[in-house]
Structure formats: structure tokens, C-alpha cells
From Swiss-Prot:
Superkingdom field: Bacteria
Keywords: Ribonucleoprotein, Ribosomal protein
InterPro entries on file: Ribosomal_protein_uL29, Ribosomal_uL29, Ribosomal_uL29_CS, Ribosomal_uL29_sf
One Gene Ontology term from the biological process aspect of the record: translation
Family: Belongs to the universal ribosomal protein uL29 family.
Lineage: Bacteria, Bacillati, Cyanobacteriota, Cyanophyceae, Gomontiellales
Pfam families for this protein: Ribosomal_L29
Protein name as catalogued: Large ribosomal subunit protein uL29
Amino acid sequence: MALSKMKDLLDLSDAEVETQILDLKRQLFQLRLQKATRQEVKPHQFKHLRHQLAQLMTLERQRQLTQQQTSVQE
């Protein structure tokens, strides 16, 4: 499974970004819980989930900053 690209996420709305961030945080928590209870976990899933989470949080922050800049200019 390849890591997702940022351009794939640009089409998402703000609400979709927020829900995906929450979903990824839950998935990471579940993965950590499985690892702590010594269940089978694929280690690469940590990397993929953290990568996606970072991309979404970056996108969310970029949108916040552009919104602030437009409100300051007006």
C-alpha cells in the first residue's frame, strides 16, 4: 500500500478533514492498544496512519491560516 498523496486530500471539505483526523486518531489508538496487548500488528500501519494524519493536520492548518489572512485583509 503506497502512502497517500497530498493532492488527493485537497478535494476534501473542512468537515471531512476533521472527521478523517478523528478517525485516524482512533485507529492509531486501537493499533497501540493491540500492540500493548501483544496482538498481531503490522508495524507499517503505524507509519501509514501517522503519515496520513500529518497530511490532514497540515491541510487543516493551511486552511486556517489562509482564512485568517483573508479576514485580516478585509
